[in-house]
Amino acid sequence: MIAALQGKSLAVLFGGRSGEREVSLASARTVIGALRDGGYAPLEVDTAQSRWWDTLGGVDIAFNIQHGRGGEDGVTRAVLDELGVLCSGSGVLGSALAMDKLRSKQLWRGAGLPTADFLEVADSTDYRAVLDAWGSAFIKPACEGSSLGMAHVSDAAAFAAAVLSARQCGDAVLAERFIDGPEYTVAILGEQALPAIRIAVESGFYDYQAKYHSEA
């Protein structure tokens, strides 16, 4: 893959201002290291700087390794499309939909795909009634990644506290029915689905700490 970049001017976009900035910085170190090992000297662009796009003059391809809002949600891709710079990853619409858990689940359900019961939390939501129906639930910011602002709740007081916490990441909050069972992740590279990997944690769920600061 790196050989296919021969003769191209490359930039790696990373950092940004989302809650996942530190994750992006770690990912960028890996990507930049691999490119350097392949004989390339990519332009390194931290998108936290103002008007970062002004640094991309002469760049042919951008590797977008940002995480979270502004980076994964189609915003960066829209800027690059406007500049005529090729970019790794999905297009604007695909990125925006994939970053929005509510819209993603609505699409899956519309396509007839099985997905856990869910609702968008509103001021009128009866937390106790939701838990009576589901038993327990996960509360998530609709447009955040890395499990930031996420909580597993089983009583109305915890539900209310989790909603307040999730809203610090954005107004839209998703409540999703808890399914007790093994968890798997599957990466998609182009049109190829890679082997499924089972996720196991010592306690709780696969939260930010487990993802980036433990042996899970």
Regions found by a protein language model. Give the residues of each.
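Glycine-rich phosphate/pyrophosphate-binding beta-alpha loops
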Residues: 68, 147, 202-205
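ATP-binding N-terminal substructure of ATP-dependent carboxylate-amine bond-forming enzymes
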Residues: 1-93, 97-110, 122-129
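Short connector loops/turns at beta-strand edges and beta->alpha or beta->beta junctions
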Residues: 85, 144, 211-213
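Phosphate-binding site of ATP-dependent enzymes
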Residues: 154-216
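Structured helix-beta-strand junction loops
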Residues: 38, 83, 133-134, 169, ...
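Active-site nucleotide/adenylate-binding loops and adjacent lid/helix of ATP-dependent enzymes
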Residues: 1-14, 42, 56, 97-182
